[in-house]
Swiss-Prot record:
PROSITE patterns linked: ATP_P_PHORIBOSYLTR
Species of the source: Bacteroides thetaiotaomicron (strain ATCC 29148 / DSM 2079 / JCM 5827 / CCUG 10774 / NCTC 10582 / VPI-5482 / E50)
Record pathway: Amino-acid biosynthesis; L-histidine biosynthesis; L-histidine from 5-phospho-alpha-D-ribose 1-diphosphate: step 1/9
Biological function: Catalyzes the condensation of ATP and 5-phosphoribose 1-diphosphate to form N'-(5'-phosphoribosyl)-ATP (PR-ATP). Has a crucial role in the pathway because the rate of histidine biosynthesis seems to be controlled primarily by regulation of HisG enzymatic activity.
Keyword Glycosyltransferase part of the UniProt annotation: yes
Identification of the protein by name: ATP phosphoribosyltransferase
Cofactor(s) needed for function: Mg(2+)
Annotated keywords: Amino-acid biosynthesis, ATP-binding, Cytoplasm, Glycosyltransferase, Histidine biosynthesis, Magnesium, Metal-binding, Nucleotide-binding, Transferase
Length: 283
């Protein structure tokens, strides 16, 4: 049985549990304990603090973990990245008081920077030849300049609203982060087989994101032009209709280009366009 370490609460917890649920892996969270076994898949979930997950996976206490890339890079544990999951996105940035003009990275020379991510910050400063003092604190990093604890901060930024409320401005994006599926490097062959099934399900869910299944009635004399517009997976499905001169076209569209393509299809005479969500896609 695979053991996967998951953040115990917060946005990463919610999005992780949603992914497992969409992969038809049932985990009860109504009476949550430290370790919960799935009722329909050979996996158990270990609920932890996010900063404990990299070490837990590297040492083999858990086989897998879902953790923010920022925590994984900060801890520098010997585990492998299996899959980028594309959610819980944020960035780690340097920020400074908004009323001070920012001339470039050289401004940080001799300054004190407050952060909960000293390893990532130290590596960045060293790479860029900046000599600054790192002040490590946990929580409420953004208040440090306002109370005189530091000149600047290095912290997670999502929307930037927390910076604004503390009269700070983001001046350097050091790294972009998202949720990662990480794994122990010494999993048994039996566990690797379970992992393959888990990845198969996760990939089906992730591939379907931002995709729509589209059905339309199309005039046969415009069929070649309509097919040329469609950026489907391989080629659309074409089915004859009872009405002479018409056929039904089924395809998959990327939501980012949906309205652009639909407009072209209507211009070519497509009618009765039906759009459906896709839960999973196996390619």
């Amino acid at each position: 049985m695979l053991r996967i370490a998951v953040q115990a609460k917060g946005r990463l917890f919610e999005e992780t549990m949603a992914l497992l649920g969409e992969s038809d892996i049932k985990i009860s969270t109504t009476k949550r304990t430290l370790l919960v076994q799935s009722s329909n898949f050979p996996i158990e979930v270990l609920f932890l603090r996010d900063d404990d997950i990299p070490q837990t996976v590297a040492t083999g206490v858990a086989d897998l973990g879902i953790v923010g890339e920022n925590e994984f890079m900060e801890k520098e544990e010997d585990a492998e990245i299996i899959k980028r999951l594309g959610f819980s996105k944020c960035r780690l940035s340097l920020a400074m008081p908004k009323d001070i003009e920012y001339p470039g990275l050289s401004w940080f020379n001799g300054k004190k920077i407050a952060t909960s991510y000293p390893v990532i910050l130290r590596n960045f400063l060293k790479k860029n030849g900046v000599n600054a003092e790192i002040h490590v604190i946990t929580g409420s990093v953004e208040v440090s300049p306002g109370i005189g604890l530091a000149d600047a901060i290095f912290d997670i930024v999502s929307s930037g609203s927390t910076l604004v409320s503390n009269r700070l401005k983001e001046v350097e994006v050091v790294m972009k982060s998202e949720a990662l599926l990480i794994g122990n490097k010494n999993m048994s062959d039996e566990k690797k087989e379970v992992l393959e099934e888990l990845l198969f399900r996760m990939n089906a869910v992730k591939t379907a994101e931002d995709k729509k299944y589209v059905l339309m009635n199309a005039p046969k004399d415009k069929l070649e032009e309509i097919i040329a517009v469609l950026p489907g997976m391989k080629s659309p499905t074409i089915m004859p209709l009872a009405q002479e001169g018409w056929c039904s076209v089924h395809t998959v569209l990327d939501e980012k280009r949906f309205w652009e393509i639909i407009g072209k299809l209507k211009g070519l005479g497509a009618e009765g366009i039906l759009v459906l969500p896709i839960e999973k896609m196996i390619v």
